[in-house]
Amino acid sequence: ATGHGIAKHMSNITESRICQNCKLNFTIEPDDFSFYEKMKVPAPTFCPDCRRQRRMSWRNFVNFYHRKSATSGKNVLSIYSPESGVPVLSAKEWHTEDWNPYQYGVNYDFSRTFFEQYTELLKRVPKPAMDNDDGLMSTNCEYTSDFAMGKDCYLVIKAWKLENVMYSFYVVNSRDLVDVNTSFGKDEENYETINTKQCYKCRNIIDSQSCIECLFSFDLRNCNNCFMCSGLRGKSYCYKNQEVGKEKYLEIIK
Protein backbone atom coordinates (compact mmCIF):
# COMPACT_ATOMS: atom_id res chain seq x y z
CA ALA A 1 0.00 0.00 0.00
CA THR A 2 2.87 2.34 0.87
CA GLY A 3 4.59 1.73 -2.47
CA HIS A 4 1.35 2.41 -4.33
CA GLY A 5 0.88 5.63 -2.36
CA ILE A 6 4.39 6.83 -3.26
CA ALA A 7 3.81 6.07 -6.95
CA LYS A 8 0.48 7.88 -6.80
CA HIS A 9 2.13 10.90 -5.17
CA MET A 10 5.01 10.92 -7.67
CA SER A 11 2.58 10.81 -10.59
CA ASN A 12 1.52 14.38 -9.73
CA ILE A 13 4.95 16.04 -9.83
CA THR A 14 7.88 16.66 -12.14
CA GLU A 15 11.20 15.37 -10.87
CA SER A 16 14.75 16.19 -11.94
CA ARG A 17 17.32 13.40 -11.66
CA ILE A 18 21.00 12.87 -12.46
CA CYS A 19 21.76 10.16 -15.02
CA GLN A 20 23.85 7.40 -13.49
CA ASN A 21 25.70 6.99 -16.78
CA CYS A 22 26.49 10.45 -18.22
CA LYS A 23 25.87 12.41 -14.97
CA LEU A 24 23.66 14.98 -16.73
CA ASN A 25 20.27 16.13 -15.43
CA PHE A 26 17.08 14.77 -16.94
CA THR A 27 13.42 15.32 -16.13
CA ILE A 28 10.69 12.81 -15.42
CA GLU A 29 7.25 14.26 -16.15
CA PRO A 30 3.99 13.40 -14.33
CA ASP A 31 2.75 11.44 -17.35
CA ASP A 32 5.93 9.36 -17.21
CA PHE A 33 5.31 8.46 -13.57
CA SER A 34 1.75 7.49 -14.43
CA PHE A 35 3.04 5.16 -17.14
CA TYR A 36 5.62 3.56 -14.83
CA GLU A 37 2.90 2.99 -12.23
CA LYS A 38 0.64 1.42 -14.84
CA MET A 39 3.40 -0.90 -16.07
CA LYS A 40 4.58 -1.69 -12.51
CA VAL A 41 8.19 -0.73 -13.28
CA PRO A 42 10.58 1.59 -11.40
CA ALA A 43 11.47 5.04 -12.67
CA PRO A 44 14.59 5.16 -14.88
CA THR A 45 18.05 5.93 -13.56
CA PHE A 46 19.47 6.68 -17.05
CA CYS A 47 18.53 9.75 -19.09
CA PRO A 48 16.56 9.28 -22.37
CA ASP A 49 19.69 9.62 -24.54
CA CYS A 50 21.63 7.01 -22.58
CA ARG A 51 18.61 4.68 -22.58
CA ARG A 52 18.39 5.06 -26.36
CA GLN A 53 22.11 4.29 -26.74
CA ARG A 54 21.70 1.20 -24.59
CA ARG A 55 18.81 -0.05 -26.72
CA MET A 56 20.60 0.67 -30.00
CA SER A 57 23.81 -1.02 -28.86
CA TRP A 58 22.03 -4.34 -29.34
CA ARG A 59 22.15 -3.93 -33.11
CA ASN A 60 25.31 -3.21 -35.06
CA PHE A 61 25.30 -2.82 -38.83
CA VAL A 62 28.01 -0.23 -39.48
CA ASN A 63 31.12 -1.65 -37.77
CA PHE A 64 32.84 -4.60 -39.46
CA TYR A 65 35.42 -6.97 -37.97
CA HIS A 66 37.76 -9.63 -39.30
CA ARG A 67 36.80 -13.04 -37.90
CA LYS A 68 37.33 -16.75 -38.52
CA SER A 69 34.49 -19.06 -39.58
CA ALA A 70 33.48 -21.38 -36.74
CA THR A 71 33.33 -24.37 -39.10
CA SER A 72 35.81 -23.84 -41.95
CA GLY A 73 38.29 -21.53 -40.22
CA LYS A 74 38.25 -19.23 -43.26
CA ASN A 75 38.59 -15.48 -42.88
CA VAL A 76 35.19 -13.77 -42.86
CA LEU A 77 33.95 -10.23 -42.36
CA SER A 78 31.55 -9.88 -39.45
CA ILE A 79 29.32 -7.45 -37.60
CA TYR A 80 30.20 -9.36 -34.40
CA SER A 81 33.48 -8.32 -32.80
CA PRO A 82 36.00 -10.94 -31.64
CA GLU A 83 35.38 -9.75 -28.07
CA SER A 84 31.67 -10.65 -28.33
CA GLY A 85 32.48 -14.35 -28.13
CA VAL A 86 29.80 -15.08 -30.75
CA PRO A 87 30.79 -17.82 -33.25
CA VAL A 88 30.13 -16.81 -36.87
CA LEU A 89 29.76 -18.39 -40.30
CA SER A 90 29.76 -16.83 -43.73
CA ALA A 91 26.29 -16.30 -45.20
CA LYS A 92 26.88 -19.15 -47.63
CA GLU A 93 28.07 -21.52 -44.86
CA TRP A 94 25.20 -20.58 -42.56
CA HIS A 95 22.57 -21.49 -45.18
CA THR A 96 24.03 -24.93 -45.90
CA GLU A 97 23.17 -28.19 -44.17
CA ASP A 98 26.79 -28.78 -43.18
CA TRP A 99 26.03 -27.89 -39.59
CA ASN A 100 23.17 -28.75 -37.26
CA PRO A 101 21.79 -25.93 -35.07
CA TYR A 102 20.00 -28.46 -32.86
CA GLN A 103 23.31 -29.68 -31.51
CA TYR A 104 23.58 -26.44 -29.56
CA GLY A 105 20.30 -26.99 -27.71
CA VAL A 106 20.31 -27.24 -23.90
CA ASN A 107 17.73 -28.09 -21.27
CA TYR A 108 16.16 -25.20 -19.41
CA ASP A 109 17.42 -24.82 -15.85
CA PHE A 110 14.61 -23.55 -13.62
CA SER A 111 17.08 -22.69 -10.86
CA ARG A 112 18.63 -19.95 -13.04
CA THR A 113 17.17 -16.85 -14.64
CA PHE A 114 15.88 -16.98 -18.20
CA PHE A 115 18.04 -14.13 -19.47
CA GLU A 116 21.21 -15.64 -18.05
CA GLN A 117 20.58 -18.85 -19.97
CA TYR A 118 19.37 -17.01 -23.07
CA THR A 119 22.60 -14.98 -23.16
CA GLU A 120 24.66 -18.16 -22.96
CA LEU A 121 22.64 -19.70 -25.81
CA LEU A 122 23.13 -16.61 -27.99
CA LYS A 123 26.89 -16.88 -27.55
CA ARG A 124 26.93 -20.61 -28.28
CA VAL A 125 24.99 -20.86 -31.56
CA PRO A 126 26.83 -19.68 -34.74
CA LYS A 127 25.34 -16.66 -36.45
CA PRO A 128 25.68 -15.34 -40.00
CA ALA A 129 28.81 -13.21 -39.90
CA MET A 130 27.17 -10.48 -41.97
CA ASP A 131 23.55 -9.56 -42.54
CA ASN A 132 23.77 -9.95 -46.30
CA ASP A 133 23.37 -12.64 -48.97
CA ASP A 134 26.79 -12.32 -50.61
CA GLY A 135 27.59 -15.54 -52.45
CA LEU A 136 23.91 -16.45 -52.55
CA MET A 137 21.69 -13.85 -54.24
CA SER A 138 24.36 -11.13 -54.30
CA THR A 139 27.72 -11.05 -56.09
CA ASN A 140 30.83 -9.21 -54.92
CA CYS A 141 28.98 -7.49 -52.08
CA GLU A 142 30.93 -8.74 -49.06
CA TYR A 143 31.33 -5.30 -47.47
CA THR A 144 27.60 -4.65 -47.01
CA SER A 145 25.14 -4.98 -44.15
CA ASP A 146 21.35 -5.43 -44.07
CA PHE A 147 21.71 -6.00 -47.79
CA ALA A 148 20.24 -8.30 -50.45
CA MET A 149 20.10 -8.96 -54.19
CA GLY A 150 22.97 -6.77 -55.34
CA LYS A 151 26.05 -6.81 -57.53
CA ASP A 152 29.41 -5.06 -57.15
CA CYS A 153 28.56 -2.95 -54.11
CA TYR A 154 30.92 -1.72 -51.39
CA LEU A 155 30.20 -0.28 -47.94
CA VAL A 156 26.47 -0.07 -48.50
CA ILE A 157 24.12 -0.36 -45.52
CA LYS A 158 20.42 -1.22 -45.46
CA ALA A 159 19.81 -1.70 -49.16
CA TRP A 160 18.67 -4.15 -51.81
CA LYS A 161 18.43 -4.64 -55.58
CA LEU A 162 21.50 -2.54 -56.42
CA GLU A 163 24.40 -2.57 -58.85
CA ASN A 164 27.66 -0.60 -58.70
CA VAL A 165 26.87 1.37 -55.53
CA MET A 166 29.40 2.56 -52.93
CA TYR A 167 29.39 4.34 -49.56
CA SER A 168 25.62 4.60 -49.32
CA PHE A 169 22.79 4.07 -46.82
CA TYR A 170 19.17 3.00 -47.35
CA VAL A 171 19.09 2.60 -51.12
CA VAL A 172 16.72 0.41 -53.15
CA ASN A 173 16.42 -0.67 -56.77
CA SER A 174 19.11 1.67 -58.15
CA ARG A 175 22.54 1.61 -59.77
CA ASP A 176 25.79 3.52 -60.22
CA LEU A 177 25.59 5.64 -57.06
CA VAL A 178 28.22 7.03 -54.68
CA ASP A 179 27.70 8.67 -51.26
CA VAL A 180 23.92 8.45 -51.33
CA ASN A 181 21.72 8.66 -48.24
CA THR A 182 18.19 7.37 -48.81
CA SER A 183 17.15 6.56 -52.35
CA PHE A 184 13.60 5.38 -52.87
CA GLY A 185 14.29 3.68 -56.17
CA LYS A 186 15.23 4.01 -59.83
CA ASP A 187 18.10 6.42 -59.20
CA GLU A 188 21.12 6.23 -61.51
CA GLU A 189 24.56 7.86 -61.70
CA ASN A 190 24.00 10.18 -58.73
CA TYR A 191 26.56 11.53 -56.27
CA GLU A 192 25.97 12.83 -52.73
CA THR A 193 22.18 12.92 -52.85
CA ILE A 194 19.65 12.64 -50.00
CA ASN A 195 16.02 11.49 -50.22
CA THR A 196 15.67 11.08 -53.96
CA LYS A 197 13.67 8.96 -56.38
CA GLN A 198 13.95 8.46 -60.15
CA CYS A 199 16.82 10.92 -60.48
CA TYR A 200 19.57 10.63 -63.10
CA LYS A 201 23.06 12.14 -63.15
CA CYS A 202 22.33 14.47 -60.24
CA ARG A 203 24.87 15.88 -57.79
CA ASN A 204 24.29 17.18 -54.26
CA ILE A 205 20.51 17.38 -54.37
CA ILE A 206 18.08 16.80 -51.49
CA ASP A 207 14.39 15.80 -51.31
CA SER A 208 13.93 15.64 -55.07
CA GLN A 209 12.18 13.36 -57.55
CA SER A 210 12.23 12.67 -61.29
CA CYS A 211 15.12 15.02 -62.03
CA ILE A 212 17.92 14.92 -64.60
CA GLU A 213 21.37 16.50 -64.27
CA CYS A 214 20.46 18.83 -61.41
CA LEU A 215 23.16 20.22 -59.11
CA PHE A 216 23.24 21.57 -55.53
CA SER A 217 19.47 21.89 -55.29
CA PHE A 218 16.60 21.14 -52.91
CA ASP A 219 12.96 20.08 -53.29
CA LEU A 220 12.76 19.70 -57.07
CA ARG A 221 10.18 17.73 -59.07
CA ASN A 222 10.38 16.83 -62.76
CA CYS A 223 13.24 19.23 -63.39
CA ASN A 224 16.34 19.01 -65.53
CA ASN A 225 19.55 21.01 -65.66
CA CYS A 226 18.93 23.14 -62.58
CA PHE A 227 21.76 24.57 -60.45
CA MET A 228 21.40 26.06 -56.95
CA CYS A 229 17.61 25.93 -57.06
CA SER A 230 14.81 25.01 -54.66
CA GLY A 231 11.08 24.36 -54.78
CA LEU A 232 10.86 24.14 -58.58
CA ARG A 233 8.39 22.02 -60.54
CA GLY A 234 8.81 21.04 -64.17
CA LYS A 235 11.59 23.54 -64.88
CA SER A 236 14.66 23.37 -67.13
CA TYR A 237 17.95 25.27 -67.34
CA CYS A 238 17.52 27.28 -64.15
CA TYR A 239 20.14 29.03 -62.02
CA LYS A 240 19.14 30.27 -58.56
CA ASN A 241 15.49 29.65 -59.46
CA GLN A 242 15.64 31.74 -62.64
CA GLU A 243 15.28 30.25 -66.13
CA VAL A 244 18.37 31.31 -68.04
CA GLY A 245 18.17 29.18 -71.18
CA LYS A 246 20.39 26.33 -72.28
CA GLU A 247 23.30 28.35 -73.67
CA LYS A 248 23.74 30.59 -70.62
CA TYR A 249 23.18 27.70 -68.23
CA LEU A 250 25.94 25.64 -69.79
CA GLU A 251 28.24 28.65 -69.55
CA ILE A 252 27.43 29.08 -65.83
CA ILE A 253 28.19 25.50 -64.85
CA LYS A 254 31.22 25.15 -67.13
Stretches with model-predicted labels:
Residues A1-H9:
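N-terminal amphipathic/basic-hydrophobic helices that include classical n-h-c signal peptides
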Residues S11-K254:
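Long, distal/terminal scaffolding or interaction modules
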